[in-house]
């Protein structure tokens, strides 16, 4: 029996607000020059891999990262779709605030709950659970059928959206998801089963220094 194709996931690289240490969430902000440079390097990690389909969020930092990766690979023909289900977690009232100043206001323990935990509420924002509830159905309904058809699929999204997706793919518990991280400058390659769950995982990384 043939196995499904390869799933590749990557986090957008440094945005203007990442550089400032600001919670970006649902806001749009462009990549920095460093972010563009490193996005191309991330593309270089995938040389020799034929990509059939690509997806990004509807946020410009994700779109710019995907575009830079495909440009580095000279894969301008690859169909790319931008979908809101892959958008970053909405940080609500914390959007636009310096995260390290917020750590002082909230205290270290509460700050880590907000950043890392499964169902920690944010005023007028999303929990990771809410992000999961939009990301995973999109993956199951749209991406998994492509993988089952033996396509190689690239997804470029955001830290929390990818954490939610990885928790499904890798069957990570709600308690352990706080330890899950999708690093800047990393691409993760999965071989998956017909439900989109991991059979094999490979991580490739470039050197990156991002204030996030």
Language-model features: where?
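Active-site-adjacent alpha-helix immediately C-terminal to a catalytic or transition-state-stabilizing loop
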Residues: 63, 137-198
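Active-site-proximal alpha-helix that buttresses catalytic centers in soluble enzyme cores
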Residues: 5-75, 105, 124-135
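Beta-strand elements within well-structured catalytic alpha/beta cores of enzymes
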Residues: 6-10, 55, 81, 151-157, ...
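Phosphate-coordination/substrate-recognition cap region in phosphate-metabolizing enzymes
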Residues: 2, 40-111, 169-183, 187-189
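Short, well-ordered beta-to-alpha junction loops that form the rim of enzyme active sites
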Residues: 57-59, 85, 116, 151-152, ...
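A polyampholytic, Gly/Pro-enriched intrinsically disordered region
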Residues: 98-110, 196-211
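Short glycine/proline- and acidic residue-enriched helix-loop micro-motifs
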Residues: 110-130
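Short aromatic-enriched loop/helix-cap "lid" or pocket-rim segments at secondary-structure transitions
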Residues: 19-22, 91-96, 168, 201-203
């Amino acid at each position: 029996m043939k196995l499904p194709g390869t799933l590749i996931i990557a986090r957008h690289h440094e945005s203007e607000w990442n550089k400032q240490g600001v919670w970006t969430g649902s806001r749009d902000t462009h990549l920095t020059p460093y972010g563009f440079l490193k996005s191309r390097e991330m593309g270089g990690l995938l040389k020799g891999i034929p990509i059939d389909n690509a997806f990004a969020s509807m946020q410009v930092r994700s779109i710019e990262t995907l575009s830079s990766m495909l440009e580095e690979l000279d894969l301008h023909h690859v169909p790319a779709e931008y979908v809101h289900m892959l958008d970053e977690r909405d940080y609500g009232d914390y959007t636009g605030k310096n995260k390290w100043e917020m750590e002082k206001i909230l205290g270290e323990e509460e700050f880590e709950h907000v950043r890392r935990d499964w169902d920690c509420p944010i005023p007028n924002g999303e929990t990771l659970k809410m992000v999961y509830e939009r990301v995973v159905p999109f993956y199951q309904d749209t991406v998994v059928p492509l993988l089952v058809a033996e396509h190689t699929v690239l997804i470029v999204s955001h830290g929390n959206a990818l954490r939610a997706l990885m928790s499904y793919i890798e069957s990570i518990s709600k308690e352990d998801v706080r330890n899950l991280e999708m690093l800047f400058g990393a691409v993760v390659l999965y071989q998956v089963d017909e439900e989109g769950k991991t059979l094999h995982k490979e991580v490739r990384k470039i050197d990156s220094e991002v204030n996030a």
